[in-house]
């Protein structure tokens, strides 16, 4: 009787956990993000960080030249003393993923808060990659637990977690490649324009960060076309989405 009661109790607990699996996944992902952000202050300045920030400022200076009126002048003043990216030796180095950091930096105002904000911003990009991996595995397996396990494996890798706070090249391109794959799968499965647009945008940022990001854009595009041919679904709408 006791053994039967114990089995029933364990079964009830497992069923209760399964029913709350999505909530548990959300809580775990939030805790992962919170822990990562909480320890950001423990990471120092990366070797290339000053150069990357200089490239970002040069990009902003370049854009200010094409914005008319007071807004363009205001942006140009903020980037005073910085050469335009078109005149820089670093003009082939992209940093599109960090355009949003320009607004975050204004809130931070001064050092050391700007460096801290830069590292937190970088970690947020890493977490977007973790979420994208969760989404990819969920699409492929339809399992919350397998998706969460895959996300934790990436997150708990010491190298990935650590560099997720300051590596603004390799970690960023990895994150946006994962995002590209996720939206590419969503586009292929659901055939909606919004996923095609998000897929293209994520691929553009990945490619801007490192040219290797273009490979995944091309591979997914070719895979989508092959799928349409195999399923004999080469309609105008499906082709236009791709």
Task: Name each model-derived stretch.
Residues 172-189, 195-203:
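Specific aromatic-rich, kink-prone transmembrane helix
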Residues 46, 165-172:
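Short acidic/glycine- and proline-prone juxtamembrane loop motifs at membrane-interface regions
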Residues 6-10, 183-192, 216-242:
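Perimembrane helix-loop-helix junctions
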Residues 120-141, 179-183:
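Transmembrane-helix motifs of polytopic, lipid-linked glycan transferases
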């Amino acid at each position: 009787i006791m053994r039967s009661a114990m089995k029933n109790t364990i079964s009830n607990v497992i069923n209760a956990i399964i029913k709350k699996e999505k909530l548990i996944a959300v809580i775990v992902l939030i805790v992962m993000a919170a822990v990562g952000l909480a320890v950001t202050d423990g990471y120092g300045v990366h070797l290339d960080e000053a150069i990357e920030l200089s490239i970002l400022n040069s990009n902003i200076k370049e854009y200010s030249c094409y914005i008319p009126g007071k807004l363009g002048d205001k942006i140009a003043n903020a980037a005073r003393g910085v050469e335009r990216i078109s005149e820089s030796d670093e003009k082939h180095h992209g940093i599109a993923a960090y355009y949003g950091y320009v607004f975050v930096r204004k809130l931070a105002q001064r050092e050391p808060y700007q460096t801290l904000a830069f590292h937190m911003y970088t970690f947020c990009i890493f977490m977007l990659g973790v979420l994208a991996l969760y989404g990819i595995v969920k699409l492929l397996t339809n399992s919350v637990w397998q998706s969460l396990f895959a996300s934790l494996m990436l997150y708990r890798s010491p190298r990935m977690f650590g560099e997720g706070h300051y590596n603004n090249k390799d970690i960023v391109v990895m994150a946006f490649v994962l995002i590209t794959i996720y939206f590419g799968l969503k586009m292929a499965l659901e055939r909606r324009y919004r996923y095609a647009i998000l897929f293209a945008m994520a691929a553009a940022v990945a490619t801007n960060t490192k040219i290797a990001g273009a490979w995944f854009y091309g591979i997914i595009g070719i895979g989508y076309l092959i799928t349409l041919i195999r399923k004999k679904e080469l309609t105008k709408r499906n082709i236009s989405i791709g």
